[in-house]
Amino acid sequence: MASRRKSTTPCMVLASEQDPDLELISDLDEGPPVLTPVENTRAESISSDEEVHESVDSDNQQNKKVEGGYECKYCTFQTPDLNMFTFHVDSEHPNVVLNSSYVCVECNFLTKRYDALSEHNLKYHPGEENFKLTMVKRNNQTIFEQTINDLTFDGSFVKEENAEQAESTEVSSSGISISKTPIMKMMKNKVENKRIAVHHNSVEDVPEEKENEIKPDREETVENPSSSASESNTSTSIVNRIHPSTASTVVTPAAVLPGLAQVITAVSAQQNSNLIPKVLIPVNSIPTYNAALDNNPLLLNTYNKFPYPTMSEITVLSAQAKYTEEQIKIWFSAQRLKHGVSWTPEEVEEARRKQFNGTVHTVPQTITVIPTHISTGSNGLPSILQTCQIVGQPGLVLTQVAGTNTLPVTAPIALTVAGVPSQNNVQKSQVPAAQPTAETKPATAAVPTSQSVKHETALVNPDSFGIRAKKTKEQLAELKVSYLKNQFPHDSEIIRLMKITGLTKGEIKKWFSDTRYNQRNSKSNQCLHLNNDSSTTIIIDSSDETTESPTVGTVQPKQSWNPFPDFTPQKFKEKTAEQLRVLQASFLNNSVLTDEELNRLRAQTKLTRREIDAWFTEKKKSKALKEEKMEIDESNAGSSKEEAGETSPGDESGAPKSGSTGKICKKTPEQLHMLKSAFVRTQWPSPEEYDKLAKESGLARTDIVSWFGDTRYAWKNGNLKWYYYYQSANSSSMNGLSSLRKRGRGRPKGRGRGRPRGRPRGSKRINNWDRGPSLIKFKTGTAILKDYYLKHKFLNEQDLDELVNKSHMGYEQVREWFAERQRRSELGIELFEENEEEDEVIDDQEEDEEETDDSDTWEPPRHVKRKLSKSDD
């Protein structure tokens, strides 16, 4: 590249020093604030041995960055800071704007209005997408020349072959110098930035620097194809890429004439992770934008924390930063647009709630633009949704925003958003973006999506994006009324609720499931007693409600707990005596409320449908509660003995019950033995079996139902120590009757086959509940550890969890027990204490009783117990 000569004195090129015939306006680039000279071919007025020094221009500022700084040619202002110089020109010289014209080179069409050029393109170039706009300055007038270039099949652009002819023409064929790099090579290690051309009026003077020698680079024009012109009603401006030899700079152009399209592009993914992808915007085109705010650390820190400040935060920032609230709001909007941050109001509120636990105000409307050419390929990379926020003038033309260094890009994207879309188009194009995570640095919101985006409906389920919508009071009221009728709704009821509430089937089912769960947790802490008042909660397992008799299965007693803990109870206004009389008469006539009766009651009582339905539901509950209480009283009268305390540890391992004011139900060992034997036979007794157990044991039916529910819960969590012993007993005896054993089977050698001594010949087994409690011994935790130690001789950490579950001991207790055995082994003393073996000792008499056909008590043999303790199914 040719060498560059720099002046040592800060200066601005005067208008008289510029070529009045033809001037090229350099485009914008992004990077650190260092000017990048780029070689550019010129027209006839510039000789081949001269070099055009690319400098940063805007509509109302002319400057050149040299070693000393910047100097204004209209006054004596000088500064080494580019932002301060920009602010000075914007505020002191706002009227340096020239007229502009638009020329279609293909048709020789000339107009002063950009809208007229767009209409011309729609009429005479329908379907054409590859427009190129070159901005030149001729005779103190800015001219935009529109040409058309073609795109090759691989995504690269056709190289202009007639470069020599282009040099001889009055205007250079390309107003922007670019490299020959094809589009597929944009993700290389070199720092490559997308460049944009902004449609604005050029400045009066163009600073340039001439050299004696120059090595012109071969050029290739790259355009960014726009979307369909019929959809956007705007045309696309050129988007070029360039390989800068040095770092490039970001300079804000001057004010843009109203109605001109603004081209927004993004920087390609950088190797340096600190460089965030940004969108270049003509910030001076935004009203009251103050570039001096870009270096304010307070504002930058606030933006990095959260890109959407509230009005109170803006007020505080205005007082601290000494800028107006309007300037700060405009600055935040420009920063969000530059960084590609575009959240919906719901997303902003959700993000603020997660980070600050507060609320935010609404933000401007957002539209999601989907690059259709990016699709899921064989490498599994998902498609990308890009969002943009409409700020300032309509007619934004968007280009591709690169995500990561590994994202393959097959062609540049030019997506056009119509300035004023119709309502239907807006609804079809609005796709909620994913909830952006509040990070220290903002990033473009992007979510994976399928290759084909469905536009059939404008409403998208928030749960699919991780956003759980809050239900309204009306929806909750309908759900509560339905829940009081039936805690397990049928499909028809779910469909009805879907139509009324507008919720999905999954949301309704989840609400019912959560409510049942909360109800069970509330019930588990309530006390159950027999001689109770009407406010006592009767614990009924949820799984039994579908198999119980109607009296028990569908009864909803008056509850002291709130079945909807996350919402306040529904309240209705008090009813008059006349209304109560009409409702009572209707209920006595028919307790089932029909639609005709409901309409009649609404007209007669002037009550709402929900109030009438709730009154009937409460009435049914109170009626069923009275019947349940009468049934409990009858069961108590039939019980002949006072119930004592429970002694079995298995029952204690069930669901916990806390004390209450009433008398807690106690079960005798005989009753517990009956229930446990029945539980081993079936965990889900039928209503007839419940009645039989209630009659034989003398317990209330509700007590039995509650016990089975608690025991099932304990069994599910592995807390039933007695289950395997009863299961073994049940396998050898059906319903309490001994089964005949095969003679000699399982007897040790030397043991006789006859009846043991001292046993009567014809004794009969009596009912279990008429005799004493069974002498069933349980393996303690140390016994299980002893069996494991005798088998393995040491503790394997992989088996630690299993030993803890079996022995019901803590992790440290198990480790200490094995450490003690190891210590005893090293000292040569007895490994096990005598009291540890007592639980395992079963005398010969008990074993004989087990093997006889007519023994009164039953105990599983020792080998069965050891086998069960080792397998622990």
Swiss-Prot record:
UniProt region (Required for repressor activity), positions on chain: 831-873
The UniProt record lists the keyword Phosphoprotein: yes
Zn finger intervals (C2H2-type): 70-93, 102-125
Known DNA-binding region: 284-346, 464-526, 569-630, 660-722, 777-832
Coiled-coil region(s): none
Start and end residues of each stretch annotated as Required for nuclear localization: 734-768
Broad class of where this protein is predominantly found: nucleus
Family, similarity comment: Belongs to the ZHX family.
Protein name according to UniProt: Zinc fingers and homeoboxes protein 1
Source organism: Pongo pygmaeus (Bornean orangutan)
Gene name linked to the record: ZHX1
